[in-house]
């Protein structure tokens, strides 16, 4: 039996539209005795909301099986004064963090979504305010640094572009709290009481999921859904341990290879 980390966006759904076979795959994995943890860089909705959306797709999971980056941020930044450029829906997840508009000790950048709120969160004035705080000595944190994400309308620009802009302007480097950071993967392993070498990461992102997990000694499986692009995989130096058509194929693949 294995410990398995499962990405969500692009693996189980795209823009809320389920990818066929996901719910059945999770049931089969549980029946086979595998230990599962759902790990996501989604930074636009609260954990309870994300978990409920997955259950509505027929995917059986408890809230505490879902690991999110806003909660990682709350743990890291507890007790600190933070200027947070995030979607309103996750503000409640930042428990213990003192959210401020000035004199911040840290600047926290969240993710984008497909709603008009993104235009407000990442407005020029908000980015300029974040830059001002960084110049005054605040430390830059990012929930993730994804360049783009896949939607039903095609790829959309993600928050990594704004993080890179602030890094360039303030001549600093962001501390990434989600995938592919070491602390995020270590938290997942600890939750499963698993060793890296006996753990599989399943995802659609060759960088955040596959390269990140391999960098921490895990085995990896790339799905041909979501962000998967054959040309990017071909050009990459990263080679997953397996490539499958979709999450639906995972139980059978593991039966053949474990």
What do these predicted ranges mean?
Residues 2-34, 43-258:
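Asp-based, Mg2+/Mn2+-dependent phosphohydrolase catalytic module
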């Amino acid at each position: 039996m294995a410990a398995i980390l499962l990405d969500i966006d692009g693996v189980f759904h795209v823009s809320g539209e389920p990818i066929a076979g996901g719910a059945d795959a999770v049931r089969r994995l549980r029946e086979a005795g595998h230990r599962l943890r759902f790990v996501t860089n989604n930074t636009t909705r609260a954990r309870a909301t994300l978990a409920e959306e997955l259950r509505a797709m027929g995917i059986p999971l408890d809230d505490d099986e879902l690991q999110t980056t806003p909660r990682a941020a709350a743990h890291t930044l507890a007790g600190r004064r933070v200027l947070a450029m995030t979607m309103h829906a996750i503000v409640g997840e930042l428990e213990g963090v003192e959210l401020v508009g000035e004199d911040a000790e840290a600047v926290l950048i969240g993710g984008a979504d497909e709603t008009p709120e993104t235009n407000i969160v990442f407005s020029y004035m908000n980015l300029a305010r974040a830059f001002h705080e960084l110049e005054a000595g605040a430390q830059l944190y990012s929930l993730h640094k994804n360049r783009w994400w896949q939607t039903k309308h095609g790829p959309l620009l993600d928050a990594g572009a704004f993080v890179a802009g602030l890094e360039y302007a303030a001549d600093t480097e962001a501390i990434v709290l989600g995938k592919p950071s070491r602390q995020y993967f270590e938290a997942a392993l600890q939750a499963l009481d698993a060793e890296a070498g006996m753990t599989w990461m399943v995802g659609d992102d060759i960088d955040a999921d596959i390269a990140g997990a391999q960098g921490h000694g895990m085995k990896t499986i790339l799905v041909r859904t979501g962000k998967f692009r054959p040309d990017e995989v071909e050009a990459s130096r990263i080679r997953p341990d397996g490539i499958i058509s979709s999450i639906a194929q995972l139980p059978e693949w593991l039966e053949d290879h474990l």
